[in-house]
Amino acid sequence: MASPGLPQPPTEDAAWPLRLLHAPPGLLRLDPTGGALLLLVLAALLGWSWLWRLPERGIPPGPAPWPVVGNFGFVLLPRFLRRKSWPYRRARNGGMNASGQGVQLLLADLGRVYGNIFSFLIGHYLVVVLNDFHSVREALVQQAEVFSDRPRVPLTSIMTKGKGIVFAHYGPVWRQQRKFSHSTLRHFGLGKLSLEPKIIEEFRYVKEEMQKHGDAPFNPFPIVNNAVSNIICSLCFGRRFDYTNSEFKQMLNFMSRALEVCLNTQLLLVNICSWLYYLPFGPFKELRQIEKDLTLFLKKIIKDHRESLDVENPQDFIDMYLLHVEEEKKNNSNSGFDEDYLFYIIGDLFIAGTDTTTNSLLWCLLYMSLHPNIQEKIHEEIARVIGADRAPSLTDKAQMPYTEATIMEVQRLSTVVPLSIPHMTSEKTVLQGFTIPKGTIILPNLWSVHRDPAIWEKPNDFYPDRFLDDQGQLIKKETFIPFGIGKRVCMGEQLAKMELFLMFVSLMQSFTFVLPKDSKPILTGKYGLTLAPHPFNIIISKR
């Protein structure tokens, strides 16, 4: 038996640092070149960490970063250690759950520690979060020319080539493309009564599909998603699709797969090491295949439109864009209008226009099922203003303040685009006393704005009356910004408002919605490109 006064060798289950100290000398021996290289790497990492810990003059405060990967280092940790890293620690009240959901909650919590404007690092990219309305407005409205660019990060650049509307860089080309796109969509009814019949027609198919379920519980997502996607199809392709159409189902599958894969945490590492995108396995390979499938699908549609184009009678957005391309070729050899740009704009319209509106409608159905008393008030307002037989119209909005207030309250609580789309500064500036360097990524936390107790009384309660005055008339609040603000405000805002009102009122006019017995829906939302409700079932009864 060994003397109790002598140190004992560690057991196999001892901590690895203890085992390392007792390792045989030969195990740790390095040749001079290897030792020098190891020391050089350690010195570089420590030096990098030390430099970043030095508070650059005026930069917003924030958590200390890791070497090389910044504050994104927790992704590299084993799952059991992630909860102890900075993103998983609850700051004060609220917080995010252990499954990693609730990025908007996390950033709101960190704002309570570091202030409404704080910073962190993803790799070498400086990210600044804006958690309150005043900082968001000052940045995106009062300093719009500086804060309206998009981040030049590898993953976005690879996927979009800097084209389209949503992720394109701010400048003359973007302004031309957005102006043309917006005016063309208006030509085909965006924000006008002329689009109303298409939305009401689409609801007939929604109603038909829902009635097939009788009094059995069903997931409303596929039906609502099909309807919203078809309205975009009407604007872009000049036609709607039957829900069983193989081409339509293929397109929705491509979009769904693209959104799902893009949310894989490993893909975010591409922004640190861009060559990872070309790895021949895992989500990297799958994303490249999805990109290829979507490209073939949309370019075939554009090709078909080009071959059948009637110059005297353009039928949809693609026709109008192709005509404009030809005009620009004659008048402007350096025009930014081409079929490649059209491809990315169509992708933007579908991804941005479908996902957001679909999830907003699903949140509406969920909240109505949870609050039958509010649902009953809406039924009463519909009966009083519209009746049981006439289809709703946008002209009814002014006479239906409670219904409109309810939609707004759902949008406030759900905030389906909680962090907007990231912005980037095009030059160095000062925001509320903080220095914001050129190229800084800006995250406007719209979710935090909509839950700010300094603005909203009992912000976590569902209370539509907060949008009504003493006479029951609608109040427009400047702090209500579900579509963002500034030069990058959502281009499809008018379409989304039309769809939400007409579809929601049509659903409420036709059905009463309840949750299955003992159902306990989760209201935290499922974070992705948008904040979607967790899958839920509902039961309808015809009114």
UniProtKB/Swiss-Prot annotation:
Ranges that cross the membrane: 32-52, 58-78, 261-281, 342-362, 495-515
Keyword Cytoplasm belongs to the record: no
Pfam families on file: p450
Lineage start: Eukaryota, Metazoa, Chordata, Craniata, Vertebrata
Membrane topology value: Multi-pass membrane protein
GO BP annotations, alphabetical order: lipid metabolic process; organic acid metabolic process; xenobiotic metabolic process
Cofactor(s) annotated in UniProt: heme
Residues that coordinate or bind heme: C490
Cell location: Endoplasmic reticulum membrane; Microsome membrane; Mitochondrion inner membrane
Enzyme Commission number(s) of this protein: 1.14.14.80
GO cellular component, one term: endoplasmic reticulum membrane
Enzyme class: oxidoreductase
Name this polypeptide is given: Cytochrome P450 2U1
